[in-house]
Every structure is written in structure tokens, then in C-alpha cells.
A protein has these predicted regions:
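An acidic- and aromatic-residue-enriched active-site/binding cleft used to recognize and process polar
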Residues: 115, 154, 229
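Chitinase-like catalytic core of GlcNAc-active glycosidases
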Residues: 1-128, 148-149
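Extracytoplasmic/secreted cell-surface and envelope-processing proteins
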Residues: 35-37, 60-62, 91-96, 134, ...
């Protein structure tokens, strides 16, 4: 059975959606900027949802025990299936301390960003695999761990000149139509040539991401996460529980 893809939603997206995705993740929770503890914990979620905690507000001197207590109460009340720590400040030492404490304390799977996960007894949240990279190469070092994969249809533009290669992200709304398909990298691509350069444009469609997740399942990935504003609905063939 295909692995589930949790669609991450903000509070505003939840309020404005007439029908919620079958599998969703709350992405509005962060460390309080005005005191010790957390801000924007959800009061309600569909049973079986995931909870995402980010460090958009730096941790500073937040108490790990208080954070664990607040999360534990929320998780138990809402029957969440997992906590995703989307931490993006690898130089912040206290972030790792908090992550380690939550992994040891909370009663549900805790999934930690790959920048922090080395040496922790927890699941790993793999950052998006760009369309010019084979997925297996990204996952090899994490074999044997529970793995959640960040998914996106963001593309990549690679410009080759005599000075070398330059890569820039390509937002999903700028991806071209048509193109050729690469079944190994699960992407589409287009090549433009002129006298001085070659431009490789690579992007993923919803069908490409669905194929990517099929390979991810074969490689041991447990679940995926994607932005609701990007995917809008589960991918073709995604598990619905």
C-alpha cells in the first residue's frame, strides 16, 4: 500500500477549507517569542494528524520539560500520530538538546530534521530530494531509521557556461508545460541551447512525485509531507488510511 502523504496546513488554510485532507499536518506551532513555552498549539485536529513544531522563533532559553509537557498534553488530546521537528538552525545547540529530550519523553514517533538527527534515537525528516539527484543516494545513510520525506514540486534550472554550472530553484508555478520524462529521477526536463550556454530546466509534476513516493516506499520511507498550498489534495494513489 502506498505510503501516506501528510499535507501541511496553516491555521488560516484550515479555517478556509471546506473539506480537510484525509491526512494532514498542523504547521503553525512554534516557540513563544514572549515567554517560555509554545505558541499556536492546535485546539482541534482530525484524528490521525501529525503535528509540526518549527524553530522560526529561536529556542533561546525555553525549558525542554515544559515544551514536552505542552506537546504531550496536545498529542494525547488530539490523538496525533507523530511529531515532526522541522528545525532549520543547525548551529543552535539548544535545538538539539530539546530534540533529544522530546525523542526520549514523548509517547509517539518524533521525526527530526536530517540536520539534527545524527546520533539521536528517533525518526529522520529528509529534506526534499532535488530533481537532479537520485533518491537512493540521499537515503542510504539513514537506512534502519524511520524516515519521513519532505516532498515538493519545486524545480531546478541549471545553466552551463564555459565558467561552470549555476543552479537556481524553480518555483512550482514557473515550471514549463510538456518536456521529456526521466523515470529514474522522477522528473520532467527541457534543454535549451545557444552559442554560449546550455540551460537544463527540471521539474516535478504531481505524477512525478507519486512515482517518487513509490520508490521511497521500496527504499523504506514511512511517510511523506507536502505543503497543502502546493499539492492541494493527496497525490494519485496516495494512501487514505
Amino acid at each position: 500500500m502506498p505510503i501516506p502523504q501528510y499535507l501541511a496546513m496553516t491555521a488560516a488554510e484550515m479555517e478556509g477549507s471546506a473539506v480537510l485532507p484525509h491526512q494532514m499536518a498542523w504547521m503553525a506551532c512554534h516557540f513563544s517569542s514572549s515567554g517560555n513555552g509554545l505558541s499556536n498549539l492546535p485546539k482541534w485536529l482530525p484524528t490521525g494528524s501529525a503535528l509540526i513544531l518549527d524553530d522560526s522563533t529561536p529556542i533561546h532559553d525555553h525549558d525542554p520539560e515544559r515544551i514536552a509537557a505542552e506537546l504531550g498534553q496536545c498529542i494525547q488530546h488530539l490523538q496525533c500520530v507523530g511529531l515532526l521537528l522541522d528545525f532549520q538552525r543547525p548551529d543552535e545547540g539548544q535545538a538539539r538538546e530539546v530534540a533529544e529530550y522530546l525523542c526520549e519523553t514523548l509517547p509517539i514517533p518524533v521525526i527530526v530534521s536530517d540536520a539534527y538527527a545524527e546520533g539521536l534515537d528517533c525518526g529522520v525528516f529528509i529534506s526534499p530530494v532535488p530533481p537532479d539527484e537520485a533518491m537512493a543516494s540521499r537515503l542510504t545513510r539513514w537506512q534502519g531509521r524511520e524516515i519521513w520525506l519532505d516532498t515538493t514540486m519545486e524545480g531546478l534550472e541549471i545553466i552551463l557556461t564555459e565558467d561552470g554550472a549555476k543552479s537556481t530553484p524553480l518555483p512550482p508555478w514557473e515550471r514549463p508545460e510538456g518536456g521529456l520524462e526521466d523515470k529514474h529521477l522522477h522528473c520532467h526536463y527541457h534543454i535549451s541551447l545557444d552559442e554560449n550556454s546550455a540551460v537544463f530546466t527540471l521539474w516535478r509534476t504531481a505524477e512525478d512525485v507519486a512515482a517518487q513516493l513509490a520508490e521511497a516506499e521500496a527504499l523504506g520511507v514511512t511517510a511523506a509531507v507536502g505543503l497543502y498550498q502546493e499539492f492541494g489534495s493527496p497525490l494519485p494513489g496516495a494512501e487514505e488510511g
